[in-house]
């Protein structure tokens, strides 16, 4: 199966995921813009998120971590404190993840153009993730990230003022990361030339 067949199949799956509400609404216009360009299609995406995660100490964190709360919008204090009521065991970590997209590029030249546009738009952590005979995968990402331990085994070690500060700080970083993503998205037509 070649690039065009992969693109067609992937876009059919994307349409299904959109209909099922599995794709962040705010990122759909960007996905559509990328997918309209011949040499590119998106394989995964997230508009960014803020959350509280409980990470086990002695189990595989990829399998056994759980979200106490996860928000793709700018979270509120009430959401934060309600999520913390569910804490039980393990490390309690406050996280903010930047928007992220994975884009399949037809060839290395297309990948290079996508990567240059991303980096010059401020998406400095963007990189080539994989290269195969069929496609090159480029990851689009900012450098903004928060990953802060705030407690352990059901006990929070910081006060509510610090938690509010951390949420405000993370919401502002997420907002800035989304602004950078939009600056890049507004330049995507340059790849049609």
Curated annotation (Swiss-Prot):
Its EC number is 2.1.1.282. Belongs to the TYW3 family. Keywords: Methyltransferase, S-adenosyl-L-methionine, Transferase, tRNA processing. It comes from Methanocaldococcus jannaschii (strain ATCC 43067 / DSM 2661 / JAL-1 / JCM 10045 / NBRC 100440). One of its GO terms (biological process) is tRNA methylation. It comes from the Archaea. This is tRNA(Phe) 7-((3-amino-3-carboxypropyl)-4-demethylwyosine(37)-N(4))-methyltransferase. S-adenosyl-L-methionine-dependent methyltransferase that acts as a component of the wyosine derivatives biosynthesis pathway.
